[in-house]
């Protein structure tokens, strides 16, 4: 089995369990069958870039983080049970995380540009 | 953490935001002035009031825009607790029911209540109100308090029950005809309504400034800039919609 796929599957499972989501929640969000999510977590199936992108925004981590092996810290905390979150709320969580990730993207652009300016001086 | 500590924390945040320890505060304006914070209006499910995302470089508050403006203010105050005092998770998704959920959520609600209605100021205000209402808190005083602090009926009732100024039974009766009770006393009804339709999806604050900056410095193309704004529900900035006639007065 492909080691990268196994790493991604393990990471996905860890993030999903930390967030308290079921495989079925993830499958609904990705609009795929639950068995596919199960296979991805076992490293038995590959994942499309679109799915990878959607998972990164759902969990609020970059795609690169999703592809690295370790989960450094808890990523999400819910004061409500997963059953209190309706289907549209997964889209909401993803949309808000997208904004946070975009903010980090823009800030990193500014930091890099400022470093380059300093190096030129 | 006991109530006194939560009160102290609320006091500290008032100070940090440049506010005294007794006056009503404008949480929309204050949170907009916090460095590195973006506020997102988003219509959420009926159980969720908001979300706080602590990012690597900046932070995001998302507020359920289907809740009344008064309740949105309470949520902003609640999320401030997560931002400043909740060290554990990077994302918190918060319940709509005040005083419910895990310990952190209950603390965040208490903090919000103290931040908006500081205990000493509220006690004085209640005393004053009771003097002119034969010693009891009636619906009129409740409406006065929610208008004075610009906060929801639910948040005021929750606090008055805690302060033993109202029984659960009396509070229950005041959970109906909320708008009418305020209108009858000559108040505007804006406090009791959700965000206007054209502002239910919208991002304010740090994010918009960041987008302008990266464009201005040539760090992203115009296409990417527009994509960033559209993902933050700011089509008005991309297509120039919704700009009302300006009045300078």
Predicted regions and their residues:
Chain B
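Active-site hotspot residues in diverse enzymes, especially metal/ion-binding acidic/histidine motifs
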Residues: 1-249
């Amino acid at each position: 089995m492909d080691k990268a796929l196994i790493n991604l599957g393990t990471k996905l499972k860890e993030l999903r369990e930390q967030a308290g989501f079921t495989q079925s929640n993830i499958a609904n969000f990705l609009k795929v069958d639950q068995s596919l999510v199960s296979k991805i977590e076992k490293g038995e199936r590959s994942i499309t870039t679109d799915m990878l992108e959607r998972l990164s925004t759902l969990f609020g981590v970059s795609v690169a983080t999703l592809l690295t092996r370790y989960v450094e810290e808890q990523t999400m905390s819910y004061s409500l049970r997963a059953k209190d979150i309706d289907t549209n709320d997964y889209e909401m969580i993803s949309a808000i995380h997208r904004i946070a990730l975009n903010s980090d993207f823009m800030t990193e652009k500014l930091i890099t540009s400022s470093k380059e300016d300093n190096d030129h001086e | 953490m006991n109530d006194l500590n939560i009160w102290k924390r609320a006091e500290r945040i008032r100070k940090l935001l440049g506010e005294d320890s007794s006056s009503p505060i404008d949480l929309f304006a204050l949170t907009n002035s916090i460095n590195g914070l973006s506020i997102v209006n988003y219509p959420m499910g009926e159980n969720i009031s908001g979300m706080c995302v602590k990012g690597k470089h900046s932070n995001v508050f998302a507020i359920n825009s289907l809740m009344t403006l008064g309740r949105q203010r309470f949520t902003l105050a609640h999320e401030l607790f997560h931002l400043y005092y909740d060290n554990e998770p990077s994302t918190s998704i918060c319940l709509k029911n005040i005083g419910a959920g895990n310990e952190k959520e209950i603390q965040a609600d208490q903090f919000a209540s103290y931040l908006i209605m500081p205990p000493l100021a509220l006690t004085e205000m209640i005393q004053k109100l009771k003097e002119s209402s034969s010693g009891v808190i009636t619906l009129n005083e409740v409406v006065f308090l929610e208008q004075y602090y610009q906060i929801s009926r639910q948040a005021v009732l929750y606090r008055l029950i805690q302060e033993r100024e109202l029984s659960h039974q009396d509070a229950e009766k005041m959970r109906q005809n909320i708008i009418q009770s305020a209108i009858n006393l000559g108040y505007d009804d804006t406090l009791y309504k959700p965000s206007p339709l054209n502002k239910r999806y919208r991002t304010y604050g740090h994010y918009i400034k960041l987008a302008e900056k990266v464009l201005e410095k040539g760090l992203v193309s115009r296409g990417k800039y527009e994509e960033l704004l559209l993902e933050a529900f700011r089509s008005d900035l991309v297509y120039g919609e919704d700009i009302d006639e300006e009045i300078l007065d």
